[in-house]
Amino acid sequence: MLRDLDILKRINEKTKAVVQMTLTTADESLCRIIEPHVCSTKERFEALKTLRDNGIPTVVWLCPILPYINDTRENIASILRMCIEAQVRGVICFGMGMTLRDGSREYFYRQLDRHFPGLKERYIKEYGDRYEIPSPRDDELMSLFHHTCEQSGIMHDNDEIFAYLHRFEEKEPFGQLSLWQLPRNE
């Protein structure tokens, strides 16, 4: 997206241009496993800071959070520190966990066997065929999430963030003159 920075800046001069991206883990090696075909966490963090420096607002999606893999206090706190430093406007989080559709589940389980031997059996035992796969640490991590965002002035209510994203903001660099401000021919 940074290759389009000039376009984003021009759009942002006229109206709000918000860039959104996911952050799943602060651990680079884990990032390559969880999201093998995307930019590294470090590259995304640098992009967030570049966007900030150019006045482009950003929103982070905190997902997926995989039970027993990246659902740690250290990981969530590290991601939130990045968000604070990058001055993101909001962080969208629907809870600590993930969803698994049929079809995706089989692929996911193969990847668990490949990268985290033995974890597939735990998932099957605890979650069965459920679509929603919540972290057993959801309450603790969501409390950390909300508290940290609140203390840092980062939007963390999903409805508030979506309202912000959908609110049209026209930017008029000079404003509109009222009838009484028009120059007179005297």
Question: Residue locations for each model-derived region?
Answer:
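C-terminal accessory extensions appended to soluble enzyme cores
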Residues: 111-186
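Conserved AdoMet/S-adenosylmethionine-binding subsite of the radical SAM
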Residues: 1-126, 130-133
